[in-house]
């Protein structure tokens, strides 16, 4: 699996109504047996948002946010999926096929990574449903 930034953010944002479910899900995954992909794109978005003034009443310091990332990456099942030589071709196909613009481009980048590595995307973002080429799962959705 590849984890989108929104799940990482909800897992640490105690103000979010999704906090407990996201935290429990992420902890379960990071302590489980299945590989958990934490792309730099997701980690970078997490770092950008949790340290930003105005998003939260008490944003994380850069050191606190980086420590969280280090803790995740130290888990035995964590890995950082990187683009392969096919990334540009796959990303270009997705952008053109779905006529993507703006905020949908990062979703296409994660979808391309998922295709390259043959894994599912875990995200609370329903925009991933548009990509028929990938498996997408929202672990926060009501069963």
PLM region spans:
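Active-site phosphate/pyrophosphate-handling residues
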Residues: 6-7, 44, 108-109
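Active-site neighborhoods of divalent-metal-dependent phosphate/nucleic-acid chemistry enzymes
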Residues: 77-122
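Acidic, PIN/NYN-like endoribonuclease modules and their adjacent C-terminal/linker elements
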Residues: 111-143
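Short beta-strand segments at enzyme active-site cores
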Residues: 37-40, 124
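Short, well-structured N-terminal submotif of metal-dependent ribonuclease cores
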Residues: 1-2, 6-38, 53-67, 143
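Anion (oxyanion) recognition and catalysis
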Residues: 30, 73, 115
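Acidic active-site catalytic centers that drive phospho-/nucleotidyl reactions
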Residues: 4, 107, 125
